[in-house]
Every structure is written in C-alpha cells, then in structure tokens.
Amino acid sequence: MAKGEGHILAQNKKARHDYHIVETVEAGIVLTGTEIKSVRATRIQLKDGFAQIKNGEAWLVNVHIAPFEQGNIWNADPERTRKLLLKKREITHLANELKGTGMTLVPLKVYLKDGFAKVLIGLAKGKHDYDKRETIKRRDQERDIKKQMKHYNAR
C-alpha cells in the first residue's frame, strides 16, 4: 500500500474480469454527509458503475451508495451521479484517450486515504469472450501449480 492509503471499502472485481486495464487514476469523490457515513460502513456497490467526462468535469455514474439508516430526510438518492475531483490536465488526458476508441472509465476500488474517500478509476478496454476464457484458464492453472507446490513442499 502506498503511504497514506488506508482501508479498502469496496472493490470492483468484475471490472478486472471484463476489461483490460490500461491506466489507473486516483480521484476524490464529492459526497454528502450521510453518503460518507454509508461508504465508511462499506455499503457501496461499484459493479455497474462507470465514469464519464461532461463539460470538462468527471462524473461517477451508476455507483450505488445505500442510504444511511439514521439519515432520514437528509439521505441523497442512492444512484445519483457524483462529481470526481481530478486535475484539469488529468481530465483532458482521459478525455483524449476516450475519443474515438473503445475505451471506457471504470471504478476499480474505493478506499480511505488520510480520512478522505478516494476512488481508483481505470482507463479500460473491453475484453472479448475468448479473452475472458483465457484469463480464467490461466488463473486455474496458477491455482493448480500452487496446490501442487504446497503438496510437494509438505513432504
């Protein structure tokens, strides 16, 4: 873990399965008070989420943050779009990468860094079905090798 990077609150394991991650960028998230309480309680889902760039600003879309149970009328919409805090040059770089290619921005994980909620955004290209099968096959082979090594070393 990098200095200051703390507790991982949510991970998007499906993203690494469905996409080739080309580049990652750390971004802050604009959250309301009850949303940050829900995030700290790990009540966040990244599975269907993605990021997009509109009018020179980055936005996180389709990320579900469950309503805070004690928040009553101050709870925000669980599916609302949330602004991502990135530097201008990072936004322009990502916007240039997204133009004309089959690239997308997916959230990979949410964690706390020095008390602030951060999201790791991945610039990703979609995998084909045969790529997914190849990844699964490679993972199974590595698992079998580890199992055999463990059995061999136990003798």
From Swiss-Prot:
Keyword Cytoplasm: yes
Keywords: Cytoplasm, RNA-binding
Superkingdom classification of source: Bacteria
GO molecular function annotations of the record: RNA binding
The keyword Endoplasmic reticulum belongs to this UniProt entry's keyword annotation: no
Signal peptide as annotated in the record: none
Pfam families: SmpB
InterPro entries cross-referenced by the UniProt entry: SmpB (IPR023620), SsrA-bd_prot (IPR000037), SsrA-bd_prot_CS (IPR020081)
GO terms under cellular component: cytosol
GO BP terms, alphabetized: trans-translation
Record's subcellular location: Cytoplasm
Principal subcellular localisation of the protein: cytoplasm
Family, per entry: Belongs to the SmpB family.
Protein task: Required for rescue of stalled ribosomes mediated by trans-translation. Binds to transfer-messenger RNA (tmRNA), required for stable association of tmRNA with ribosomes. tmRNA and SmpB together mimic tRNA shape, replacing the anticodon stem-loop with SmpB. tmRNA is encoded by the ssrA gene; the 2 termini fold to resemble tRNA(Ala) and it encodes a 'tag peptide', a short internal open reading frame. During trans-translation Ala-aminoacylated tmRNA acts like a tRNA, entering the A-site of stalled ribosomes, displacing the stalled mRNA.
Name under which the protein is recorded: SsrA-binding protein
Organism: Streptococcus pyogenes serotype M5 (strain Manfredo)
Taxonomic path: Bacteria, Bacillati, Bacillota, Bacilli, Lactobacillales
